[in-house]
From Swiss-Prot:
Active-site residues from the entry: D95 (proton acceptor), D269 (nucleophile)
Region (RNA binding): 250-256, 274-278
Binding site for substrate: D95, S96, G97, G98, F99, D149, Q192, G219
Highest taxon listed in the record's lineage: Bacteria
EC number(s) given by UniProt: 2.4.2.29
Keywords of the record: Glycosyltransferase, Metal-binding, Queuosine biosynthesis, Transferase, tRNA processing, Zinc
Pathway: tRNA modification; tRNA-queuosine biosynthesis
Sites where the protein binds Zn(2+): C307, C309, C312, H338
Catalyzed reaction equations: 7-aminomethyl-7-carbaguanine + guanosine(34) in tRNA = 7-aminomethyl-7-carbaguanosine(34) in tRNA + guanine
PANTHER family registered for this protein in UniProt: QUEUINE TRNA-RIBOSYLTRANSFERASE
Oligomeric form and interacting partners: Homodimer. Within each dimer, one monomer is responsible for RNA recognition and catalysis, while the other monomer binds to the replacement base PreQ1.
Protein name: Queuine tRNA-ribosyltransferase
GO biological process, one term: tRNA wobble guanine modification
Length: 380
């Protein structure tokens, strides 16, 4: 049986671990490295599917935990799955719900069977097992699904992380056994291990032996420094098969996308661009711009003079500032559109730089313009 998700390697960058490729899904083939907008509740906040399509989004992420609680996976299944429910004709990826259980839910209790917790909406008692997570995701109907994992804090003790990694591996095997639709839904295993090299190696070895169609790198962007995250990626991505996609979960700042691509990551997602947009913070080629600040009240230039998105072609900083100060929803739509377009366009530039074998030069120029003032990474 052909796997639902396939990866085609097109080219490796000469000077780094970066790779240009294609993610092949039941709902289309998409170029990688790629950024995936997050639609937590089966909607990318304030934006229509047509707008996401127009700006070049290929795969959208939705959150299993939130959709399980509301409206419930059975309603989504009844609608014909997430693609029909939200009218998105391209790729959809769902997480397992594990991260939300560990970050949002109260009174959680982790056992070998799964996680007991209280619903953060109404306080009711809930239970999520590896099997239940897969059943929910099968019903939601995305192209790509995640195994249930525990995401331990980056600075947790070695002993705790060691036990957590072993349990996550057992949970991955249990989830794989009950996965109903491997022919049109690809299930990824999630590599954990915090900052411990030997535990990351063990986690990757366990999961690669199960032959998932793709692999996620979890437990990063959870409070550690950028240098620590890059260090973990340096020794983690080489552990994963070259013929499978690699997905770095929950990472969405411009510098982290470039540095992740340099280290061989193919897929990224994060709520960051839309979350900061709702606070009036915009990503531009010259760095972050807080457009609601008084300094922009009389500024009749675009958010970013190097951007050709709908927002920058049609509206000024002064107007967008006015909308946000007046609590007009249109302002949030404009900043959200711009930030997502900015990251999707950035990944297009990264792909071109890989093709041209000048990704380190691109990184240096981008970081100087953006204001990161960082040196080229030397160790891959």
């Amino acid at each position: 049986m052909e796997p639902a998700i396939k990866y085609r390697l097109i080219k490796k960058e000469k000077h780094t671990g970066a790779r240009l490729g294609e993610l092949i899904t039941p709902h289309g083939t998409f170029p990688t490295p790629m950024f995936m907008p997050v639609g937590t509740q089966a909607s990318v906040k304030s934006l229509a599917p047509e707008e996401l399509d127009a700006m070049g989004a290929g795969v959208i992420l939705s959150n299993t935990y939130h959709l399980w609680l509301r409206p419930g996976e059975q309603i989504v299944k009844e609608a014909g799955g997430l693609h029909q429910f939200m009218n998105w004709k391209k790729g959809i990826l769902t997480d397992s719900g594990g991260f939300q259980v560990f970050s949002l839910a109260k009174n959680r209790d982790i056992t070998e069977e799964g996680v007991h917790f209280k619903n953060h909406l109404n306080g009711s008692k809930m239970f999520l097992s590896p099997e239940k997570a897969i059943q929910i995701e099968n019903d939601l109907g995305p192209d790509i699904m995640m195994s249930l994992d525990e995401c331990p804090p980056f600075f947790e003790s070695y002993d705790y992380v060691s036990k957590s990694v072993a349990r996550t591996s057992r949970w991955a095997e249990r989830g794989l056994k009950v996965h109903q639709h491997p022919d049109y839904q690809g299930l990824f295993g999630i590599v954990q291990g915090a900052g411990f090299k030997d535990l990351r190696e063990q986690s990757a070895k366990d999961l690669v032996s199960l032959d998932f169609p793709g692999y996620s790198i979890g437990g990063l962007s959870v409070g550690e420094s950028k240098a620590e995250m890059n260090h973990v990626l340096d020794f983690t991505t080489p552990l994963l098969p070259e013929n499978k996609p690699r997905y770095l979960m929950g990472v969405g700042s411009a510098d982290a996308l470039i540095d992740g691509a340099i280290r061989g990551v193919d897929m990224f997602d994060c709520v960051l661009p839309t979350r900061i947009a709702r606070n009036g913070t915009c990503m531009t080629s010259h760095g972050r711009l807080v457009v609601k600040n008084a300094a922009y009240a009389h500024d009749f230039t675009p958010l970013d003079d190097n951007c050709d998105c709908y927002t920058c072609r049609n509206f000024t900083r002064a107007y967008i500032r006015h909308l946000i100060k007046a609590d007009e929803t249109f302002g949030l739509r404009l900043t959200s559109y711009h930030n997502l377009y900015f990251l999707l366009h950035l990944m297009k530039q990264v792909r071109q730089a890989i093709m041209d074998d000048n990704l380190l030069e691109f990184r240096q120029n981008f970081f100087e313009m953006y204001g990161f003032n960082d040196k080229n990474p030397k160790n891959f």
